[in-house]
Amino acid sequence: MTSDKDINDKLKTSKILWYMYWGFILASIVLIIQIIHLKVFWEPRPTTEHYFRPRNRKEILKPERGAILDHNGKLIAVSTPMYNIAIDCTVMKESYARDKKEGKQKEKEWKEKACRLAQELPAVLAKDGKDAAYYRKLILDGRSQNKQYVPITKGINHNTLVKLKTLPLFNQDKNTGGLIVERMDTRQYPYKSLARSVVGYVRNNEDTGVSKRRGIESKYDQTLHGTEGLRWKRITDNKGTIQDTDSAMVAVVNGNDVRTTLDIDIQDIADRALRRQIESEMDIDGGCVIIMDVKTGAIRAMVNLNRGSNGTLDETYNLAIARAGEPGSVMKTATLMTLLEDGLIRLDDEIETNHGKMKNVKDDETIKKYERNNKTDKIPVIDGFKLSSNYVFRYLVKEHYGKKPEEYLARLYEYKLADAFDFELEGFAKATLPDTKSKTWSPTDLIQVAIGYSATETPLHIVTFYNAIANKGKMMKPYLVESIEKEGDIIERFKPEILNGAICSKATADTLLRALKTVTSEGTGTKVKNARCKVAGKTGTAWVVMDPKYTEGRGGVYKDSNGRKQYQGTFVGFFPADEPKYSAIITIWSKPTLQSFHGGTLPALAMKEIVDNTYALDCEWGEEIEKKGRIPEMEAEEIYTDNEKGSPVPSVTGYGLKDALYAIENSGYRCVYEGWGHVVRQSPKAGTPLTKGQTVKIILR
């Protein structure tokens, strides 16, 4: 039999086990609740959060800004890497201090290397103009003051960086030599300020300053900029970083390239021609040139030169689209077109000269001279046009539209002379024509518009109108951007657009061609008579409305208190006259002056130079002629190379243009190319050893 003692022991044990069982159950419940709380509800305090999270940091990946290309694929703007250099003067200093046996000797050797480095830096960094003593003091002072960051130089290219890495200390790893290299992408413009007012300017892809708010760099900023990427780096125990593979990564998307309609060779020709005519004439305040492809409306050149306070001519303001004013006699072609289209006149019709007199307007001295020279009291319309007679066109408009001015003005609106084009660049000035329904309308406005007053036009409006005449009446919309591209592949293409299918009949266009050819052969535009191909065009001169503070008390708006006037002189036309390829306008503006400037002088001379050199540039117009236009290249210091004599040519087959250029120039060679797209052939072949500076040719399709 079981004794009472055994029974009591069993009961006691059972009771203990029962308590233990429920104790474990309760502990498990508490533990589960705590785990759920920690996982779902609990958040660490901000002050202690870093103790509970992995040590990592976010790194923003910057995109590479897309390039801006000309019509033929030449780089107008491109982002390239540049480097800032510094030195960590504390490297190995603590380690040497702890080394009781050899520490002092090693520290002495480090300083000796620093002195040799200082001795060689002036030759490599000659552009900084510092001597060896400067660098020696800079580095040794940094060492004694325990400075971890001592700037050495800024904005060097890859070639200079390679040379620096061969110098004492800098030829060691960064933990022993202290070299700090900071890469930055900078915007390079191989053609310098050429087309600056069209292309725009940025320092780099992060530039958000005022300088960027113009040109293609501004208008297409989002396209060029690209999209930032993101990755996480984990901090290691030795304060280094490694890729955190547990965290999400957002890939960087580099910017797209923008291919413009510009032809940089023609741009250079136009720039030099305009400069040559106005550079030495200090009374000229500025000028512009637009060259347009007749069939498409593509702008091949747009030059804008403004005279600064120091007298130099710079591309600071887009006069071609942003300056609207009374155009002068170039408007007579629109008047002549209207009269011809309405069947009211023929070029050989004659009108009474009447000594150039009309009521309420100044006598026309041109007519008086014509009467004396020709012993006549009549003048054919074509002679009035080639001599740019104000009387003839005032008379014709008053005679035929005096009682119905709205019909004449309606025609001008059809010619898009008051339209706001949907143009790629910002800052397009408003063109205006008078309105017969306006309270300010006066009958005088009719005869003034006929000769280019009482209306405001930009040079782009005028050349677009003349381009339509060259195109047999079809008016094309002017445009500046041809396509958006990615590594040579076209993402979006912008095709030519028609503004007006027929502003006039082909017969009228042919008649106007005859009249415009007469201007350049016998009339006010004879400065272009001996150009290398026939030019059809018209001159125009207008007084510029002056600031009221200069004209106060004079009773007019065109003359200041000293009798000075401001002039706008224009030559506009197309060439070759019989088979037009390009239309062009050259406009200059003067300061207040006692001289007079006309469209048949400086603008016409600039036009002749443009025609001659563009003719030489284009073999399709005749025999092959050596190209006269200077094509600027990047300075040698901007070609990045990491090789010495005998380095092999890199393989770039399949590359886009930008990557191919970078790879070849980064290897120390010059690059020339044909076509666009991707590289299909290169010469010499990949792997061929060349001497630094030799040329590699690539073909793209």
Show where each model-derived region lies:
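Residue-level detector of short coil/turn "hinge" positions at structural boundaries
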Residues: 132, 171, 346-347, 419, ...
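Ligand-recognition elements built from short beta-strands and adjacent flexible loops
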Residues: 532, 586-590, 595-601, 606-701
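Preference for bulky hydrophobic residues occupying beta-strand positions
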Residues: 85-87, 200, 260, 323, ...
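Beta-lactam-recognizing serine transpeptidase/beta-lactamase-like catalytic domain environment
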Residues: 2-4, 77, 236-249, 262, ...
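Extracytoplasmic
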Residues: 61-64, 71, 78-84, 147, ...
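Periplasmic/cell-envelope proteins involved in peptidoglycan metabolism and beta-lactam response
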Residues: 1-312, 407-414, 529-531, 589, ...
